Regions:
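Conserved N-terminal entry element of GNAT/NAT acetyltransferase domains
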Residues: 1-19, 147-157
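Conserved acetyl-CoA-binding loop of GNAT-fold acetyltransferases
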Residues: 2, 122-131
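Acetyl-CoA-dependent GNAT
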Residues: 11-74, 79, 92, 98, ...
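Short acidic/glycine-enriched loop/turn segments that link adjacent beta-strands
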Residues: 46, 115-116, 135-140
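A short, internal acetyl-CoA/4′-phosphopantetheine-binding micro-motif in the GNAT/acyltransferase core
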Residues: 76-83, 112
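Conserved acetyl-CoA-binding loop-helix of GNAT-fold acetyltransferases
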Residues: 84-97, 123
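Conserved GNAT acetyl-CoA-binding A-motif
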Residues: 99-112
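Conserved catalytic-core motifs of GNAT/GCN5-like acyltransferases
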Residues: 108-110, 127-143
Length: 157
């Protein structure tokens, strides 16, 4: 029991996010950021979408976001018949260029722990920061980080 006269706080599950939740998060995260980082961080999500096309056909995509100076690559996928030709690497590099343009200093991603994934991401400047045993459907996943994000080549490929 709390001190006499303390407010009773009720917790409940709600079906939709009330507008005041966004206001609460913005206000309280700003206070938490100042306490933890000594600065206000911009938590606005800025989407990063890089596509590869062969004519009108979508051949691959890198999809993610930049939030508070950190890029997160959510999806990287190349059409099965287009794999093995360097397209995934080109998508990752352009994703990183765009993320840096939006203020990101580093890029984070999570993917299955396979030799192919490990080799690919290490070739593109990522290092392993965590292994997540049995993370998804019993399979291990790896978290990778690329820092610094910017590379010398900043053009379209």
């Amino acid at each position: 029991m709390g001190p006499e006269g303390a407010d009773v706080i009720a917790c409940r599950v709600v079906e939709a996010e009330p507008p005041e939740v966004r206001e609460f998060l913005a206000r309280e995260w700003a206070l938490a950021d100042r306490g933890l980082f000594g600065a206000d961080l911009d938590w606005t999500s800025r989407p990063v979408v890089v596509e590869a096309r062969a004519g009108r056909e979508l051949a691959g995509v890198a999809l993610g976001e930049v939030v508070a100076g950190m890029a997160r690559l959510h999806d990287l996928l190349v059409a099965e018949r287009r794999r093995g030709r360097g397209l995934g690497g080109r998508l990752v590099e352009l994703f990183c260029v765009r993320a840096a343009d939006l203020g990101a200093a580093r890029c984070f991603l999570r993917c299955p722990d396979t030799p192919r994934h490990r080799s690919f991401y290490e070739r593109h400047g990522f290092t392993t920061i965590a292994v997540l045993p049995r993370y998804y459907h019993g399979h291990d996943f790896v978290e990778y980080l690329r820092e610094p994000l910017a590379q010398e080549d900043r053009g379209e490929r």
